[in-house]
């Protein structure tokens, strides 16, 4: 597996990873409105902005793009792995790469964790430092954990 900087040519594959993963995983934890919100949020425009920032990468298995990660400053803004590749170390590989990049400028990292990912981040040493609630249509609420980790100096 290799973690590479994302390019514009990879945007469709990244879009597929995000939407496939959201549609497969999030309904187990959230109502339909939250799943729909995440799919709208992860639009092609949003993906192209992440690529343009230089802070978005992809995880490949041979030639297949199977995961993606992105950060802004010391905030990890997204980690997604195709469902067929989950629980195989792919998310950890992406996190290792993101944390390494962030540790070049910061000693702590923050992220907003969906309910489906909290245990994964806890196993990586993240601690919940707050709770977020984002109000959606039909009085539905998106609930998430605000998590933080102290990074080792490189």
Each predicted region: which residue ranges?
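A short beta-loop-alpha structural element at the N-terminal edge
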Residues: 1-16
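Conserved GNAT-fold acetyl-CoA-binding loop/helix
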Residues: 19-45
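Conserved beta-hairpin
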Residues: 53-67
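Conserved acetyl-CoA binding element of GNAT-fold acetyltransferases
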Residues: 72-84, 112
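Conserved acetyl-CoA pyrophosphate-binding loop and the N-cap/start of the following alpha-helix
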Residues: 84-85, 89-97
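C-terminal "cap" of GNAT-fold acetyltransferases
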Residues: 107, 111-118, 134-154
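Conserved active-site tyrosine of GNAT-family acetyltransferases
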Residues: 121, 126
């Amino acid at each position: 597996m290799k973690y590479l900087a994302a390019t514009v040519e990879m945007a469709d594959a990244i879009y597929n990873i995000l939407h496939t993963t959201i549609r497969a995983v999030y309904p187990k934890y959230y109502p339909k409105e939250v799943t729909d919100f995440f799919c709208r949020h992860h639009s092609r425009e949003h993906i192209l902005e992440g690529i343009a920032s230089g802070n978005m990468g992809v995880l490949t298995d041979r030639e297949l793009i199977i995961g993606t990660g992105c950060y802004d400053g010391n905030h990890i803004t997204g980690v997604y792995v195709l469902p067929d590749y989950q629980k195989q170390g792919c998310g950890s590989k992406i996190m290792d790469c993101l944390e390494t990049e962030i540790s070049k400028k910061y000693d702590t990292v923050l992220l907003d964790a969906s309910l489906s990912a909290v245990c994964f981040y806890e196993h990586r040493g993240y601690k919940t430092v707050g709770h977020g609630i984002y109000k959606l249509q039909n009085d539905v609420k998106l609930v998430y954990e605000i998590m933080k980790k102290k990074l080792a100096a490189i």
